[in-house]
Amino acid sequence: MSELNNIALKILSNGKGILAADESTGTMTKRLGAVNVESTPENRLLFRETLFSSESMKTCIGGVILYDETIKQKSSSEKTIPELISSSGAVPGIKVDTGAKVLGDSPNEKITEGLDGLRERLKDYYKLGARFTKWRGVYIISKNYPSKLSIDANANALAKYSSIVQENGMVPIVEPEVLMDGDHTAEDCLNKTSEVIKKCFEKLIQHKVSLEGIILK
């Protein structure tokens, strides 16, 4: 697991941050449309290549989260996008969850999906150059939420995902996001967030995930 720890440390070294460039095609279409640019594969690639080629990449960015489309593309210099990112000293990563869906017995809450076929996808992403991954769990706050069901289900999914990712030689970003929306107090947010994170780490330990080889977001 020392290699995973080295990857995590490289991503976060010298105060560098992680660039989230994993916007879906739909999100990129809205973003480019706002400046009257057609959302073609070529234009989406040009937008991202401009980001990844900037001088600030070398001093400010330790890791880049990519979208499935982008990790498979080549730059104008014929480098793959992961190669372009690596040449700046950053680590290429990939979003692997498939989105949040309604949680069966709690229709106001969400469960993040993407475990089906994850091992096979990770093998492909590793060959393409990815060395870390992202998975986001989403929790809402109100008088009755997040429910125990939501806390347990999302923590379990995050732990299973993390275990599979580490098996495949990559560092998992563990992202249990407690949404700020609502009329709750800051103290409520602190208490619920603490409960969520505690459960996540309980599940990570149960699934024998190496904590030195993860990044908590």
Language-model segment annotations:
Residues 1-128, 141:
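Alpha/beta catalytic barrel-like cores
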Residues 35-39, 110-117, 146-157, 184-196:
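Alpha-helix N-cap and loop-to-helix initiation/capping positions
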Residues 40, 135, 174, 216:
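Conserved, mostly hydrophobic/aromatic
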Residues 91, 171, 213-215:
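Proline-centered loop/turn at the N-terminus of a beta-strand
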Residues 99-103, 138-145, 179-183:
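Conserved radical SAM core fold
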Residues 118-132, 154-170, 196-207:
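Structured alpha-helical segments in the cores of large, soluble enzyme domains
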Residues 168-171, 176-178:
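Amphipathic alpha-helical interface segments within eukaryotic helical scaffold
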Residues 207-217:
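Catalytic alpha/beta core domains of metabolic enzymes, predominantly
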